[in-house]
């Protein structure tokens, strides 16, 4: 029964990996996934391609490894997010309330009571988006972020120095892909920008 549950979870993860890899075809590359998370009871096991457990931890929520780092949420009552390496060791401590995966060498993190900050893989602060309500991972050197203006969310794009490249004037937006991003104007009409 337990083996069937683990195989079912593994099948679901593998199916989602197929879909996830297909999304990366747009950028012309398929990412190799070296370790896959599966849950067994309260433990998250990271297994390799030979179905061998590399390490485990009590993590209720995890990510796949991206740029050799995975995001994990601790199981404590006041759960926090940190980043682990391929051996399961924390490379950045679990002190964040929210975080994104690393992409293009950077991730966004939020400490309790603070604004989103961009960090590198060493945990060094690159910049803070003081007015941002949300921020996504980098795509083509730009990250989509939102601010609240007169009760409404507005979306714009920031570069890796923290400078706004495209002002937050859109009522909806998507990340850049192949040099273009879908955006929605104030009238609700969608189009593309480059």
Report residues per predicted region.
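Intrinsically disordered, low-complexity segments enriched in polar/charged small residues
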Residues: 9-12, 78
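Residue-level detector of conserved, function-critical positions
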Residues: 23-194
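Bacterial N-terminal signal peptides
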Residues: 11-21
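Bacterial N-terminal signal peptides that target proteins for export
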Residues: 2-10
